[in-house]
Design a protein with these regions (language model features):
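Short beta-strand-centered aromatic/proline hotspots
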Residues: 75-83
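Short, charged beta-turn/beta-strand-edge "cap" motif at the junction between a beta-strand
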Residues: 69-74
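Single conserved hydrophobic/aromatic residue that forms the stacking wall/gate
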Residues: 1-9, 13
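Short, surface-exposed secondary-structure edge patches
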Residues: 53-58
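Short, solvent-exposed secondary-structure boundary/capping segments
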Residues: 86-97
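Long, low-complexity intrinsically disordered regions
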Residues: 115-149
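Short, basic/aromatic beta-hairpin or loop at an interaction surface
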Residues: 28-47
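Loop/turn positions that initiate beta-strands
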Residues: 62-65
Length: 149
């Protein structure tokens, strides 16, 4: 069933397109950070949206997403509030903090995301480096499908 209808969201979101997805290699942990309000941003590799066969449109302000856990269960609905594209080496400490991971520092963010993006790019013919364009996305939770304990 459609989460929007099954949770009484039909009237609010009926005409809104949305995507359903989980966060990287740790969907449960990162979804929990979203639910607790710690994680209010994410990042993705800009160039990978334009790969042949890629069907995901570039996120834009106002977009809705259903966040899934590792069992593909809906956790919450978020709305993108801001997107910016910057080179990997220029992702700000503010963005790293909003991502809510680890100690929330830029050094931690770079360490974890350098490995993550390098792995993603290894599956393509593209090269990942410090000048690779990163889509920084900020969002807010507009509906919680799962209560935080």
């Amino acid at each position: 069933r459609d989460l929007r209808m099954s949770r009484g969201l039909g009237d609010v979101y009926k005409r809104q397109p949305y995507k359903a997805w989980g966060f990287g290699d740790a969907p449960d942990q990162l979804a929990d950070l979203v639910l607790t309000g710690i994680k209010t941003a994410t990042a993705s590799a800009y160039d990978l949206y334009f790969m042949e066969g890629e069907e995901d449109p570039l996120p834009q302000s106002g977009d809705y997403s259903i966040i899934l856990n590792s069992k593909d269960e809906a956790v919450c609905v978020i709305q993108t509030t801001k997107t910016t594209v910057v080179p990997f080496d220029e992702v700000s400490k503010e963005h790293a903090y909003k991502e809510g991971e680890g100690d929330r520092s830029l050094a931690y963010w770079r360490d974890v995301h350098e490995d993550f993006f390098a792995e993603e790019f290894a599956e393509t013919e593209l090269e990942f480096n410090g000048q690779t364009s990163i889509l920084c996305e900020e969002f807010k939770v507009v509906y919680r499908a799962i209560d935080v304990n």
